[in-house]
């Protein structure tokens, strides 16, 4: 790639329409702590999180010509989904199955901790250069059963967990982390919402 903005590029994304998970926090860390790294973030032009990326710089509009160019030029493709940063996840998933992949190293940041069997993430079905694990038992499980080379799964923790640490906060806290749920499904999730509200209310009462 001739253009300097695509050289030694780290391309980062989540689902392509958001910036609020491990992809965002990893990208923010790169921009704030390692400005010498040429990092860019893929996100839709009309995303509600667009301003967060514009504030950091390096936005690549999803589906644009620059997205395709960045995808094929990048040295590292970093994302919370498999086929990270692909302009079309389904298309590039099938192309990868035929051995046709972008040149960049593929880094799978994940969303959270894997606790169940997920055969579609096994090496026979998926290619990754780095499989980030957020817990030691998870790392050992993936290392021993998913079929990747020993260097691929790495226990390095999840980027968004770093944001939970606030050295200046001394009070005791109880952290509640429900499993992932699409934001649009919350209004109809009456039972889970009621259960979590009860737990939080009980916890607050117990700590007073």
Model-derived features: positions:
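Active-site and donor-binding regions of nucleotide-sugar-utilizing enzymes
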Residues: 8-164
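Non-catalytic membrane-proximal stalk/linker segments that position and tether the catalytic domains
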Residues: 1-9
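Serine/threonine-rich low-complexity intrinsically disordered regions
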Residues: 3, 46-49, 149, 195-196, ...
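Conserved catalytic-core segment of nucleotide-activated headgroup transferases in glycan assembly
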Residues: 21-34, 159-208
């Amino acid at each position: 790639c001739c253009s300097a903005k695509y050289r030694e590029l780290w391309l980062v994304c989540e689902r392509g329409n958001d910036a609020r998970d491990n992809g965002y926090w990893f990208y923010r860390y790169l921009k704030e702590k390692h400005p010498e790294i040429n990092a860019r973030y893929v996100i839709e032009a009309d995303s509600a999180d667009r301003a967060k990326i514009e504030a950091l710089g390096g936005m690549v509009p999803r589906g644009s010509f620059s997205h395709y160019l960045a995808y094929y030029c990048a040295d590292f493709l970093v994302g919370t989904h498999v086929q990270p940063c692909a302009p079309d996840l389904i298309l590039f998933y099938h192309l990868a199955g035929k051995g046709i992949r972008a040149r960049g190293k593929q880094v799978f940041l994940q969303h959270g901790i894997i606790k169940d069997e997920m055969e579609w993430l096994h090496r026979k079905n998926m290619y990754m250069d780095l499989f980030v694990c957020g817990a030691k038992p998870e790392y050992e499980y993936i290392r021993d059963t998913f079929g990747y080379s020993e260097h691929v799964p790495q226990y390095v923790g999840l980027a968004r967990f770093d944001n939970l640490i606030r050295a200046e906060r001394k009070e005791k806290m109880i952290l509640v982390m429900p499993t992932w749920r699409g934001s649009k499904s919350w209004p109809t999730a009456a039972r889970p919402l009621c259960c979590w509200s009860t737990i939080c209310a009980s916890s607050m009462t117990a700590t007073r």
